């Protein structure tokens, strides 16, 4: 019985690759230094899998930045602006595409399906020239072979590559990207020929787009591609790997009818219906099924007994020698190694498995199927599963009851938004086009040091409070000097918008090294939600009241919304996600009520990640949006009409969910918009009726560039062409945490001047 891993984290157990990349980018180390770190990491990963007994070990899943960018390099599809002149693509061109350089911007980055990983989007057009320009896949196969490890080289499949691309600048938006299939397949043939010559016997094509809603034309491209590659692939075993959702019946039919393909990989965690499909539609005889039963996207130990039952039922259909135990997707979406968690509570730790432990689980399942079950290992797993089910720290009866009582009500505020805005205006007395910022202010080295020392107990609580108070006072003073209308306290006490709340809620645990790659060298460390969520004490009220006492202007209370906390955490898998979300919503609701009681009249509840949780298939959108929007309304349904509820959203493409956003029933919504002005405004141009306050970002905080007053005024005027004067707010598009004060002050100065300029124009037009 064989075992397989779809892919493995690249960063290293202690983020070795991150630090090597950043050192290289800063000019502090050489290309050779970076390559050495990468070579050592690859070798240790291959050795680890070989030692664990994995039969099908992947190669070419390592990347210096992103696997889709690696494919762009392999195909030589470098956009013209990078002035690449041919030959093997080196670090200079590769990292310019990923990060931009002094003279040209980076390629666009977008989310990889519904994960928190981001890929670099290929820019293609009818004139794109393709040539074999990066031999990485072959080099890494040979590198592993020299170490005595025979691997399965992994390539992003040709059809998914094109479906994930976008038309380059200047190319018609309607350009048919799939028309380039015949242009890229010759390069794939060259790569396949080299891999064969190097001794490869298996090859894995990742074609995750097969789980999306595809039309017949798109499905036909898979048949065309793998028919065209058939002779090149002869003599090789070919695995097509899918992940992140069920495979639709039509896609399954197309996939299983491909002659050149020997094996199919399915995600049986997110794809709970795929098992039924294999049973009902049948499975082609003589082909392999790679069964993704170990979750590649979470940190929970596998329920080995349950997985074994699934595998045994598949074995009856596929045959003993054709079933391979695998992960549901690449393990790059989970943390690296539990061994490095020395401070984690031992009971909670017994419920977890990171990437290194999941490799062992896959092999243990394969051996059990082959009649070599490790009884002690399985018994320990059964005990851990039982402890998790019965542990008193997981269940809080009071929370369960409160969450159950939410059903049957839609938790709307009693008065409609226009009446509320009138009541709020009487109390707040804001000018037309009120100015505000999104929440965070620059976090200086000194500020980070204070937080670090307080956490390490090197300074007293009094010293810490005094330092944070001083910072808040500075931020309030700056905003008053700039004449901003609705102030923020700058969030100096917060390291991260999710972790800060998770640390104060029960049901959350935190790791020391549970890092997961987000993009390039950037990693995130998601909290773990292991049990029922509740709020033992107020979390932000102390700081918000302190800040409000420093000014007569309205001070915003700042909270992270329940959907964002959920989508940016590793979530418990023993109850539906929406139940956990409702529990978080109830905890945030208590905080909102305490802020209101403490005299805070404007409360912002950020839902940066609301859209991120949208399922991959349209049929599932309505259910998700229904409970996500409901969770938001739960947080603030009990406040008075005079309390103004803001929310902030961090993505540009939400035209398709505008009605759900309206349904959130916030008083004011601020949106990251500056990079995609037209996209957002087109929604309102198309006649969507929107009556609440709205603040589309007037400048991009992700860039150090300081926008001029004229430029911001021009943006505001564009917005006023489609939005009513009395609902428009003026604000940056995101928090200012990552910027320097030397950038923030002039940018905000110009923003306030622009708002005043337009106010004067509007007044004189009357």
UniProtKB/Swiss-Prot annotation:
Give the residues the record marks as binding Zn(2+) 2.
Answer: 659
Q: Which UniProt keywords apply?
A: Amino-acid biosynthesis, Cytoplasm, Metal-binding, Methionine biosynthesis, Methyltransferase, Transferase, Zinc
Provide the primary localization.
cytoplasm
The cofactor binding remark recorded in the entry reads: Binds 2 Zn(2+) ions per subunit.
**UniProt binding sites for 5-methyltetrahydropteroyltri-L-glutamate:** 18, 116, 496, 519, 522-523, 568
What Gene Ontology terms describe where this protein resides (cellular component)?
cytosol
Give the UniProt record's GO annotations in the biological process aspect. methionine biosynthetic process; methylation
Q: Which residues form the active site?
A: 702
Which sites bind L-homocysteine?
438-440, 491, 606
Tell me the domain of life: Eukaryota
Q: What class of enzyme is it?
A: transferase
Q: What task does this protein carry out?
A: Catalyzes the transfer of a methyl group from 5-methyltetrahydrofolate to homocysteine resulting in methionine formation.
Which NCBIfam families does the entry mention? met_syn_B12ind, PRK05222.1
Q: What is this protein's record name?
A: 5-methyltetrahydropteroyltriglutamate--homocysteine methyltransferase 2
Organism equals Oryza sativa subsp. japonica
């Amino acid at each position: 019985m064989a075992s397989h891993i779809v892919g493995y984290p690249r960063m290293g157990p202690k983020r070795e690759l991150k630090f090597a990349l950043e050192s290289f980018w800063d000019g502090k180390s050489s290309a050779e230094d970076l390559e050495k770190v990468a070579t050592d990491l690859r070798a240790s990963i291959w050795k680890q899998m070989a030692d664990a007994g994995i039969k099908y070990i992947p190669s070419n899943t390592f990347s210096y930045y992103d696997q889709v960018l690696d494919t762009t390099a392999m195909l030589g599809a470098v956009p013209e602006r990078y002035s690449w002149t041919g030959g093997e693509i080196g670090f200079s061109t590769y990292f310019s595409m990923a990060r931009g350089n002094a003279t040209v911007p980076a390629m666009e980055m977008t989310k990889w399906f519904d994960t928190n990983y981001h890929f670099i989007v290929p820019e293609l057009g009818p004139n794109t020239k393709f040539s074999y320009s990066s031999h990485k896949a072959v080099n890494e196969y040979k590198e592993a072979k020299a170490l005595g490890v025979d691997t399965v080289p992994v390539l992003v499949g040709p059809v998914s590559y094109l479906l994930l691309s976008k038309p380059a600048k200047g190319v018609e938006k309607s350009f048919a990207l799939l028309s380039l299939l015949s242009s890229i397949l010759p390069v794939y043939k060259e790569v396949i020929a080299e891999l064969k010559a190097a001794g490869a016997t298996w090859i894995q094509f990742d074609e995750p787009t097969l789980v999306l809603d595809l039309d017949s034309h798109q499905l036909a491209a898979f048949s065309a591609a793998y028919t065209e590659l058939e002779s090149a692939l002869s003599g090789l075993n070919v695995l097509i790997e899918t992940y992140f959702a069920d495979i639709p019946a039509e896609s399954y039919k197309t996939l299983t009818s491909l002659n050149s393909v020997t094996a199919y990989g399915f995600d049986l965690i997110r794809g709970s219906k795929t098992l039924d499909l294999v049973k009902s539609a049948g499975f082609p005889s003589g082909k392999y099924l790679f069964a993704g039963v170990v979750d590649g996207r979470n940190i929970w130990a596998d329920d080995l007994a349950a997985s074994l039952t699934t595998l045994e039922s598949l074995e009856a259909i596929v045959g003993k020698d054709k079933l391979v135990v695998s992960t549901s997707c690449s393990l790059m979406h989970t943390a690296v190694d539990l061994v490095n968690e020395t401070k984690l509570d031992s009971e909670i730790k017994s419920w977890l498995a990171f990437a290194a432990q999941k490799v062992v689980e896959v092999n243990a399942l394969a051996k059990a199927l082959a009649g070599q079950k490790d009884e002690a290992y399985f018994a320990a797993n059964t005990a851990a599963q039982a402890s998790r089910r019965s542990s008193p720290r997981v269940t809080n009866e009071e929370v369960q009851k409160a969450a159950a009582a939410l059903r049957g009500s839609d938790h709307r505020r009693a008065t409609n938004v226009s009446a509320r805005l009138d009541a709020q205006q009487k109390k707040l007395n804001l000018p037309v086009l009120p100015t505000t910022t999104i929440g965070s202010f620059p976090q200086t080295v000194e500020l980070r040091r204070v937080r670090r020392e307080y956490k390490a107990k090197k300074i007293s609580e009094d010293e810490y409070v005094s330092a944070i108070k001083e910072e808040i006072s500075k931020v309030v003073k700056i905003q008053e000097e700039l004449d901003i209308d609705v102030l923020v306290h700058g969030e100096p006490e917060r390291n991260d918008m999710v972790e800060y709340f998770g640390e104060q809620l029960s049901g959350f645990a935190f790791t020391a090294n549970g890092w997961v790659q987000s993009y390039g060298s950037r990693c995130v460390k998601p909290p773990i939600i292991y049990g029922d969520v509740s709020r033992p004490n107020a979390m932000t009220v102390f700081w918000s009241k302190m800040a409000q006492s420093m000014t007569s202007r309205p001070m915003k209370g700042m909270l992270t919304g329940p959907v964002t906390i959920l989508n940016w955490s590793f979530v418990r898998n023993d109850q539906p996600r929406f139940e956990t979300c409702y529990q978080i919503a109830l905890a945030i609701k208590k905080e909102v009520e305490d802020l209101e009681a403490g005299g805070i009249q404007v409360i912002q509840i950020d839902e940066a990640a609301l859209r991120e949780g949208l399922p991959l298939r349209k049929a599932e959108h309505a259910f998700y949006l229904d409970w996500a929007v409901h969770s938001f309304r739960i947080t603030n349904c009990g406040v008075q009409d005079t309390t103004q509820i803001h929310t902030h959203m961090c993505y540009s493409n939400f035209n398709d969910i505008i009605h759900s956003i309206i349904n959130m029933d916030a008083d004011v919504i601020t949106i990251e918009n500056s990079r995609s002005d037209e996209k957002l405004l087109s929604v309102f141009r198309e006649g969507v009726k929107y009556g609440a306050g709205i603040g589309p970002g007037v400048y991009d905080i992700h860039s150090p560039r300081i926008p001029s007053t004229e430029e911001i005024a021009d943006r505001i005027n564009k917005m006023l062409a489609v939005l009513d004067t009395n609902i428009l707010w003026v604000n940056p598009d995101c928090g200012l945490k990552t910027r320097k004060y030397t950038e923030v002050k002039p940018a905000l100065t110009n923003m306030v001047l622009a708002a005043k300029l337009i106010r004067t124009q509007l007044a004189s037009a009357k």
